[in-house]
Amino acid sequence: MKLLQIRLLVNDFKKSVEFYKDSLGLPISWLENEMEYALFDNGETKIELLSRETMAEIVGEEKKSLEGEAQSKFLLQFKVEDVDKTYDDLHEKGVKCENKPHDRKEWSARVAHFRDPDHNLIEIYKML
């Protein structure tokens, strides 16, 4: 078994597409506005966006609540050349970061964290 891609189920499809395309600069390889589906192919790892409503219909969960957020359930990690520069670029684009770049000695890495429009946690990461 091999992981193919990660599908994020989003509340505001248009806003999420703009965030991943414009703020993060990920290239879109497939976009279906009517179905509210987008595929970003960033090399080895692909990220899909699909509206939560559409996915709920597909799996028969349309009557279940979309509310009830808790602590983060997962994290998307992006390897970058320079955490501080990437942080500054994101900040200039209006991305609200959770923390400033800092070293995690136990990971031998420099990291910073922010969230997408659906509050999914994202980490930028560089080995020390």
Curated annotation (Swiss-Prot):
Domain VOC as annotated: residue spans: 2-127
Record flagged with keyword Hydrolase: no
Q: Transmembrane ranges?
A: none
| GO terms, molecular function | lactoylglutathione lyase activity; metal ion binding
Concerning SUPFAM superfamilies, the annotation shows: Glyoxalase/Bleomycin resistance protein/Dihydroxybiphenyl dioxygenase
Domain of life per record? Bacteria
Q: Which amino acids does the record list as binding Ni(2+)?
A: E48, E123
Family stated for the protein in its record: Belongs to the glyoxalase I family.
Name of protein: Uncharacterized protein YraH
Q: From which source organism is this entry? A: Bacillus subtilis (strain 168)
Its gene name is: yraH
